[in-house]
UniProtKB/Swiss-Prot annotation:
NCBIfam families: A_tha_TIGR01569
Top-rank lineage group of the source organism: Eukaryota
Similarity comment: family membership: Belongs to the Casparian strip membrane proteins (CASP) family.
Biological processes per GO annotation: cell wall organization
GO cellular component: plasma membrane
Cellular location(s): Cell membrane
Topological region Cytoplasmic: 1-42, 112-130, 199-202
Protein's name according to its UniProt entry: Casparian strip membrane protein 1
Amino acid sequence: MEKSESSTIQIAESSKDRKGKAPLLPPPVHHERAAGYKRGVAIFDLILRISAATAALAATIVMGTTEQTLPFFTQFFQFRASYDDLPTFTFFVIAMAIVTGYLILSVPFSIVCIARPVVAAPRILLILCDTLTVTLATSAAGASAAIVYLAHNGXSDANWLAICQQFNDFCQRVSGAVVAAFVSAVLLIFLVVLSAIVLKKH
């Protein structure tokens, strides 16, 4: 019996064919690295967000509970100072309460950005709302800072007397509330910058 031998001929691919073919599953190194970077930024965002909420809450509580009554009084007058005597401080309490509420409600969206760092929709929503909240916080803090300055120094041109020599505790508390509001506003600005950096990487 005759046995037929079969031989196989292997043809090497040319360099042009090799260049034209792309790998089916490219290594996802760059994608994983970008996701890890965005997740780290999102964690830092969450920390700043909680810190800003704490500062805004402290500013709201301190200003909203500020009241001082002097130990002496006359037959017709009792010398008392409260935050609601001034419309600017009332606006401050309302504005910072809104800022606090927003920051607390935005925490779940920040957690979503940690869990799914590649998704851009939560980050876009946060940067828009953060920008509006920065405007509200800075307007409340700036207006109240002007009143605090007048309370400490007065205005001789307008014949406004400084009241902090008499209402020392009142002035210390409102000053602390304004400082806390500015801290919250600065942290909100950092949050806007972080969101802008992450969106630029998309």
